[in-house]
Design a protein with these regions (language model features):
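Loop-to-helix entry region of an early transmembrane alpha helix in multi-pass inner-membrane enzymes
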Residues: 56, 60-67, 72-92, 123, ...
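Transmembrane-helix motifs of polytopic, lipid-linked glycan transferases
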Residues: 81-102, 116, 139, 341-344
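Transmembrane-helix signature of polytopic, membrane-embedded enzymes
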Residues: 94-116, 134-135, 153-156, 358-361
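Multi-pass, polyprenyl lipid-linked donor-dependent membrane glycosyltransferases
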Residues: 30, 57, 78-86, 109-144, ...
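Extracytoplasmic catalytic/substrate-binding loops of multi-pass membrane glycan-assembly enzymes
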Residues: 24-38, 48, 53-65, 74-77, ...
Length: 413
């Protein structure tokens, strides 16, 4: 109860932001309609995607979360206020996880920094995947840490960590590929090092994959493709591969550009028109092939797009055909500080790798796999939020245990 009271000011700030935002946006805004529509489809037919070409655009995780609200006919503000409760629960998770490595005071400082991070506040009032992903990431970090620190309940925390990672993949399908990469990595690590910590991490990823099997099987019956997560990946990779000098790999149109023409995508108009009548899976495959061709033909331009994309992931800039505006500072200033801090912490992380607790290394690696995957897809600042709590765990540990606060000298072990 004391922890909840100490987090109450942060919770009140979150609630006020959501209430004020909802007063100005009582209806659905860009990005929300897709998830609400999916939730209604799940409620009415048990299917996320309906119609003549029922291939989901995104994972079912967040629409499933919205289903109870739609059953109860909850207004939009109620569904948005749920985000404040998700962040409160996530903060409780994170406080308990960080207490193993820092004092209570610094654990609260870290959690408040996360909760007041401007990008978190920007997307908090919206019915999109990021708030629930923050909660799930906090839960994943907590259970992976307790899996090592609480031997008496190790099996419980192992299973729960797997469930949280699995639901993260259902909410943000990129985590599906993170799971696949992590399975291979931890399997090799377990075979080479023969350490139980690596074996436990492997079991977590296998449980996470098992959580996703029903969804993957349903997609397989629709598409004939194993391990097919959603149809958005091809378009994202296509924009990232753009060979035109004025473009930086960002998303130039709405989610379905073949349904209409946008001036930003004028250079892509002919190719986009050729996709209009294709089935979803064939369209996705065509986009992927064209993206790969662009990358092979213009590797230097793709490298430039990649640098711009990583920068955009942290500071929400640059964008194609768009100049800077004062409002961009909301993301650029804190994002630049976060990016610099992460780059500075890479050095002590590498230097002290063997002395960093296994559970912190594992949380860091999952976040690293996700960021690496997002770096080759068209990215924005909101896409960093699903691993932001894991980054907080990593940064807090590194700053507390490998850097001397008085003079910032590294401690090498």
């Amino acid at each position: 109860m004391r922890t909840v009271l100490r987090l109450l000011p942060l919770f009140i700030v979150h609630v006020l932001i959501i209430v004020v935002y909802s007063q100005g946006h009582p209806g659905l805004v860009a990005g929300e309609n897709r998830y609400v529509t999916d939730a209604v489809n799940l409620m009415e037919s048990g299917e996320q995607a309906v119609g003549k070409d029922p291939v989901p655009w995104n994972g079912p995780g967040y629409p499933l979360f919205l289903v109870p609200f739609k059953i109860l006919r909850a207004p939009n503000i109620t569904m948005r206020l749920a985000n404040a409760f998700l962040l409160l629960l996530g903060s409780l998770y994170l406080i308990r996880a960080l207490r193993y490595y820092v004092s209570g005071k610094w654990a609260y400082v870290a959690v408040y920094c996360m909760g007041l991070y401007p990008v978190v506040l920007k997307y908090l009032p919206r019915m999109i995947t990021e708030p629930i992903c923050i909660f799930l990431a906090c839960g994943l970090a907590f259970h992976m840490i307790h899996m090592k620190r609480n031997p008496e309940r190790r099996t419980l925390h192992l299973v729960l960590a797997g469930l949280y990672l699995g639901f993260l993949a259902l909410a943000k399908v990129l985590f599906g590929y993170v799971i696949a990469l992590a399975i291979v990595f931890f399997l090799v690590l377990a075979l080479v090092q023969r350490k139980r910590s690596a074996l436990r991490a492997l079991l977590v990823t296998l449980i996470a994959l098992a959580v996703c099997v029903p969804y993957l099987y349903k997609n397989y019956t629709r598409t004939g493709k194993p391990f097919y997560w959603a149809q958005a990946g091809g378009l994202s990779l296509y924009w990232m591969s753009s060979p035109f000098e004025e473009e930086y790999g960002d998303w130039l149109t709405g989610t379905k550009p073949w349904l209409g023409n946008y001036w930003k995508a004028e250079k892509h108009k002919r190719f986009m028109e050729s996709l209009q009548d294709l089935p979803a899976v064939e369209r996705d495959d065509t986009l992927r092939r064209e993206a790969v061709r662009n990358i092979k033909d213009h590797p230097g331009k793709f490298a430039k797009n990649w640098v711009a994309n990583v920068t955009r992931l942290f500071i929400h800039h640059p964008f194609s055909y768009k100049g800077q505006a004062m409002r961009d500072l909301r993301s650029m200033v804190p994002g630049s500080a976060l990016l610099v801090l992460c780059l500075l912490c890479v050095i002590p992380t590498v230097a002290n790798w063997r002395s960093i607790p296994a559970e912190v290394r594992q949380v860091f690696l999952i976040a690293l796999f996700y960021v690496a995957g997002n770096s080759v897809l068209s990215a924005y600042d909101r896409m960093l939020l699903p691993v932001f709590p894991m980054m907080v765990v990593w940064l807090t540990y590194i700053l507390a245990h490998t850097v001397q606060p008085g003079c910032f000298r590294l401690r090498f072990h």
